[in-house]
């Protein structure tokens, strides 16, 4: 099994896109990259912990590759915005790919280069690729939010602008690029 740790705005919206893929074993919402141990949601929202809202995905590399995980990831948010996502602004909502080994780092950098070269987006992809430091699972009420609160989840996606972008911002599958 392998692990991918990815941030792209509100973690509620990063879970569901991965659930329908074979080889994805678990998806946990949490906080990653900061200096405060075991932060709470309230602490992370102050933008003083260094953490971002992220998901940690456990996957079977024999079934789905890290590159495939990145293909799904880049269809879920705006990678040209480094200051948050949609109406969620600030440090805790910035996108980040946290790599767990050099192969993940290389794959992420190649994927970003390919997206930029293909000019998939109107602006350059600015999603940073950073070494993995830590991950703290979020409070239980944040886990599988789309299942626990489907009406609110849907309203949040539509109201934030994320739903429209997740369907339209890629004009061809990123898997064709790398």
Residue ranges, per PLM feature:
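Single conserved hydrophobic/aromatic residue that forms the stacking wall/gate
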Residues: 169-178
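Flexible coil/turn and secondary-structure edge motifs
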Residues: 1-170
């Amino acid at each position: 099994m392998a692990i991918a740790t990815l941030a792209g705005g509100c973690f509620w919206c990063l879970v569901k896109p991965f659930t329908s893929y074979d080889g994805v074993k678990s998806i946990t919402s949490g906080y990653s990259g900061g200096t405060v141990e075991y932060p709470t949601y309230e602490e992370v929202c102050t933008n003083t912990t260094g953490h971002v809202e992220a998901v940690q995905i456990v996957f079977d590399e024999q079934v789905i590759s890290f590159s495939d995980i990145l293909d799904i990831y880049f269809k879920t948010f705006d990678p040209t915005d480094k200051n948050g996502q949609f109406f969620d602004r600030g440090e805790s909502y910035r996108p980040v790919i946290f790599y767990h080994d050099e192969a993940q780092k290389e794959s992420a950098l190649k994927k970003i280069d390919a997206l930029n070269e293909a000019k998939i987006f109107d602006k350059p992809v600015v999603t940073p690729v950073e070494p993995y430091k830590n991950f703290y699972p979020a409070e239980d009420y944040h886990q599988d939010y789309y299942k626990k609160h489907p009406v609110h989840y849907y309203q949040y996606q539509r109201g934030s602008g994320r739903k429209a972008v997740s369907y339209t911002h890629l004009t061809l599958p990123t898997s064709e690029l790398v």
